[in-house]
Curated annotation (Swiss-Prot):
Main localization of the protein described in the UniProt heading: Golgi
Protein name in UniProt: Rhamnogalacturonan I rhamnosyltransferase 1
One GO CC term, this protein: Golgi membrane
Pathway: Glycan metabolism; pectin biosynthesis
Organism classification: Eukaryota, Viridiplantae, Streptophyta, Embryophyta, Tracheophyta
Keyword terms of this UniProt record: Carbohydrate metabolism, Cell wall biogenesis/degradation, Fucose metabolism, Glycoprotein, Glycosyltransferase, Golgi apparatus, Membrane, Signal-anchor, Transferase, Transmembrane, Transmembrane helix
Amino acid sequence: MCKAEKFLYHRKLWEMKVKFLGDSKIDKLKNSLVLRSRMSLWMIRAMTILLLWSCFVHLVAVGEMWGPRLLKGWPSCFNHHDFPIAAEMTSLPMKIALPPKRIYQNNGYLMVSCNGGLNQMRAAICDMVTIARYMNVTLIVPELDKTSFWNDPSEFKDIFDVDHFISSLRDEVRILKELPPRLKRRVRLGLYHTMPPISWSNMSYYQDQILPLVKKYKVVHLNKTDTRLANNELPVEIQKLRCRANFNGLRFTPKIEELGRRVVKILREKGPFLVLHLRYEMDMLAFSGCSHGCNRYEEEELTRMRYAYPWWKEKVIDSELKRKEGLCPLTPEETALTLSALGIDRNVQIYIAAGEIYGGKRRLKALTDVFPNVVRKETLLDSSDLSFCKNHSSQMAALDYLISLESDIFVPTYYGNMAKVVEGHRRFLGFKKTIELNRKLLVKLIDEYYEGLLSWEVFSTTVKAFHATRMGGPKRRLVIPNKPKEEDYFYANPYECLQLLHENNGNSLEET
């Protein structure tokens, strides 16, 4: 049952209780008036108001236990007729009690500089919250990456609700917006320690290696944060804190959330919609060396770009070999064929959650010819609506993130950071359908279909059969000891945090 349905159910139940209790009280009071003429009308009104108020307070308390909501006032699953309810819920101001502050002996201060795109940084922030809590240190609001390919100058407060971040986690860890003045002076004088922590580390590494440095220098700066905490073999309470930071602590700014609500409302007014994370931007193709379907000029342009960034270590890449291994994003042509084979209705709205597609309309034509209702945020909103996040790729990505969470189906064409983090968040919201494409299988089938070795019926049936169990449902993570890059990513499937959802759905975790 989605949250909107729960809201209606509880509201009807509440009204029934009020009616029953109200009638009972009034009947008794009327009898009392007959027997005792001294009872006055104002007492009836006072008791009725008191009763209604107590019921309302109870309802609010129950409402706060329903779990996280994606956007303020939104249900976690949608029908297009739900919006009057959503509006009514939004109009009810609720004062949420803050958790009590956790009192602990502070061992020092942890500064972190996140690297990568929005979703890589999002996961890293959750890891840093957990690490700071475990070491009993004070976390300084993380610094976001401003020097990578995206060159986005956004600060933490430009993307996330920083006050909510601090207050919602204060019963676990102390978070400050900046260092105290005396420690700022130490940092200016260089009296602190900076380092990149080892990737995929467990908690004993932070306890034995990092904590002594914090105690010695008072301030430690971690200048790399991507995948610095292991996927597995961590205590359950550690994993659950990672989830709490991700699903409750990190909330986008009101401006981004409001814009997200507007886009989803526009889409919902026309029916269901699918979000396609078409990872076919120039930077992705240049970095990965994937140029299938590109012309000679485009291949040379992508190669030049790859050599222009020295921190992109791999330079000589066999594009076709990489594609056959399933390591390339699907092209727009391959994507159109795959969606058709999966049985996606050609009239469904497809929202493209991505930057500028390489090759523009020429490459998108293969997709729009089959699925004519392809839209983007730029086509749904006026340019003035997006002006505040223009040239801020992380803020644009935050908007796409929100819309991806609320879609009926989410389909990423490449299994990058956004695909993984959104998949895990959609699992948390009730195992919402996310199609994890098997690219290695798909390119093999697509090539055989183009070569005439497979009929459409066989091609489509095979694609559907192999993806029937790749829809974002309950399952355990694949664990590969000593090979963290090859095993399932924690944030794509945080199953330690989903046990209640499994039980409510009558499902058990399947071994993979």
